[in-house]
Amino acid sequence: MKVASSLVGGRDPSPELAAEVVHNALQAAGVERADSVLLFLSRDYVRHAQPAIIAAARAAGTTQISGCTAYGLLNEQGWLLDQSGAVALVIAQSPAPATGDRREPLLSFSGHHTLPYDWQALPARAGLLDAEAVAWAHGRLAGTPGAEVRLPGMHARLASSPGLRLLGLPLTVTATTGYDLRQLGGLAAVDSLQRCLPAGLHAGAPHRP
């Protein structure tokens, strides 16, 4: 299996932007076509989603395009806010799933104000719920309750976060680069985090490169 992502920003919510982000992700994966694509578009694509989905499908060589619009986009390379953009995760050369294999993660995307009733029972899901989102699966805009897709050939275990936790007293921001935090209270941001973390969490904390 080969997997890679790409994040692209632009001036307008155009289909070309969706095609570009898929093309870049394919290049990063070292493949010419994908088995499936997770495609997320900025909020200004709400009225322009279907042409973008079609463009992404043509670029990927598959109709298995799933995702939704979102207020912010991110991948391992960076993030976008308040700007037209697209992010894609391409999955290629995925193995055929075993018959009845339900360990494949179930992703769900909905534009409802509340979690759809049919989604409140098992199986467990991961995804996005946004009252103003447009969602799609298998290359088409989804109706009620939203879009659902399983990622073929992937096995996953869902884990949930208990939420935010106060680590210490407020600290003065002493250095930034654009929107990136560099120093807190005179310490590098990562060193400040290490100092505030409980002892049991030090091993999993980020470290200075």
Where are these regions (language model features)?
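Small-residue-enriched flexible segments
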Residues: 1-36, 40-46, 50, 55-57, ...
